[in-house]
């Protein structure tokens, strides 16, 4: 499983998260809704990678950054392409 596939599966399995791909120039994003913690999301995503033997050998998580949009937060992975 690739890093991008793992992120997509994790988001599909986790309540309060959505994929955010409306700004493809920023890369693949995770929309963390409302009262959910983006830091907790990142920690749980890391645990998900460990549990599913996903290794970031190509450094695709490099440059990850966060933007706030109202009550929501978007975690961007600029090295991963958004799919439109």
Language-model segment annotations:
Residues 1-29:
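An N-terminal amphipathic alpha-helical segment
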Residues 19-84:
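Acidic, low-complexity, intrinsically disordered interaction modules
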């Amino acid at each position: 499983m690739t890093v991008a596939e793992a992120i997509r599966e994790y988001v599909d399995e986790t309540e309060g998260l959505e994929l955010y791909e409306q700004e493809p120039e920023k890369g693949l994003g995770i929309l963390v809704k409302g009262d959910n913690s983006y830091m907790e999301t990142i920690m749980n995503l890391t645990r998900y990678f460990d549990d599913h033997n996903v290794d970031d050998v190509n450094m695709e998580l490099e440059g990850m950054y966060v933007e706030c949009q109202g009550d929501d937060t978007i975690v961007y992975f600029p090295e991963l392409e958004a799919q439109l």
